[in-house]
Amino acid sequence: MVELGFIHGRFQLFHNDHLRYALLAKAQCKKLIVGITSPENATLIREEIDPHRSEAASNPFTYYERFNMVKLALLEAGIPREDFEITPYPIERPEILYNYVPLTATSFFTIYDDWG
């Protein structure tokens, strides 16, 4: 088990597969950091692979709403509040990501989305 784990996603809506991803990662670490990508909907960058992903209709929730969805889902799943953190994760700006997640965190990934 690692000390610090990390996952990230848009979580435009935090659904059951996202929760499963978070719980599987949490089982591998003492503390989990959850990064919410595209924290500022106004700065969404058009994605060539799926242009709809950057449209306002595909991003109905604010960072604050997504933060609360993630927090409440993890608490409801039985994860103590002191065992996870939630942070913005502006993935479109890789040069500043170290400001949001420690470089010592182990990143956990999954691939299961409809966009490719």
Could you describe each region identified by the protein language model?
Residues M1-G116:
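Nucleotidyltransferase catalytic core that binds NTPs
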